Amino acid sequence: AITAGALQPGRLSVHREPWGFSREQAV
């Protein structure tokens, strides 16, 4: 699921999974 967040923009990621959004911001 984290991979999906990375593929999608942070804004969309935060909607699906907050941790994925945070991870992309850190990276």
Swiss-Prot record:
Role summary: Required for mesendoderm differentiation. Interacts with glucose transporters and promotes glucose uptake. Probably augments the glucose uptake capacity of glucose transporter proteins to meet the energy needs of mesendoderm differentiation.
Protein name according to UniProt: Small integral membrane protein 43
Family annotation (InterPro entries): SMIM43
Upper classification of the organism: Eukaryota, Metazoa, Chordata, Craniata, Vertebrata
GO cellular component terms, A-Z: plasma membrane
GO biological process: mesendoderm development
Recorded coiled-coil stretches: none
Membrane topology classification: Single-pass membrane protein
Subunit comment: Interacts with glucose transporters SLC2A1/GLUT1 and SLC2A3/GLUT3; the interactions may promote SLC2A1- and SLC2A3-mediated glucose transport to meet the energy needs of mesendoderm differentiation.
Organism from which the protein derives: Pongo abelii
